[in-house]
Amino acid sequence: MERLEAFNPQRLQWCMTDAQIDIGHLANDVGISERTLARAIEGEIGLTFLQLQKLGKYFGRTPLFFLEEGTPEPQQIRSPQFRTLLNQQHNLDQKIKRIIQLAEWQREAYIDLLDELDAEDRIDFDPPDLTNATPISAARQARQWLEIGSEHTFEQFRSAIERRGILVFRANGYAGKWQIPSTHPTIGFSLYHSSYPIIVVRKESVEARQTFTLAHELGHLLLFRESTIDSVESLNSHARKERLANEFAGHFLIPQESLNQIDASSLSDEPEVLESQLQDFRRLWGVSTDTILIRLIASNRLEQAVYDDFKEWRGSRPAEQSAGGSREWRHREPKHILGDTYVRAVLQALDTNKLTLVKASKYLDDLKLTDIKRLERYYAGA
């Protein structure tokens, strides 16, 4: 295959420095020999288009990126939202950077799709002004704005949020470009835009955890109107914004009138008994025992020591494992990752010939054409 002499080694070096990866690890990850990459970086040879595709996929760039002249400037190739996250976490690894880029690309694709559809019912993101609101008041106003009633599952909260013009993406449980590994500290992030802001939540083996992350990221968007990235440590952080986002999430998921249903005086000090006593409430509200206990402590209805004992007991138990899943349901993955609102827009564009099958595949997480047909039948109820 022909080598492209227009290959710009400076751009590959920039990507490697940005990703904090050396040539040996890059060669192993992309399947190009270390010697070939070394010679290309030294300007001795060009690279083939297929090799540029591999590099582009790895770094979240197009093959043409490596053919352009000059060294890229961060402000030219990264959005202000992306740069905000990088300022918060200077050593953000390449896996998370690629997911941020992917989320931004999906947002742009969705907006372009709405233009193609000439959608008159485009949703305006017009949240209540919560600038000076307390977390309790903000959570109450947010529930009213989202018209939250008996919603208690992740998908129900997600649908309510999407109806108000926020894109909610959930990282995949399978290995792939959308996967945030369960061992990775990042649990989610939000990218603030005046229209169609983004929330990305890591898939968890326990749904209540990802539901809390969803509410936490919603708090960041509504309370502070800024982009942020969160790790497991964020949920225990005493930093002002993290603390307020956590309080918001707790009150959003468990309003005071719901919490009042619990007779705290009857709760046991024994962690295992306590877990059993709160089981019905966990299922009713779609939250974890931790969220309930923290709300009770904040309401001065439970001693901190009870929760400390519970955490110690929980930490001694084997971690819950996800069942994994079957690739037989690959055609439904775009709905789980991108959300029902997004997938319906793509299928509508496909049905009205506004989108080709090939382009629809790219919009739907590179779904194979046969799986797109299965997805269409699934939505048609066949």
Predicted regions and their residues:
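Active-site hotspot residues in diverse enzymes, especially metal/ion-binding acidic/histidine motifs
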Residues: M1-A382
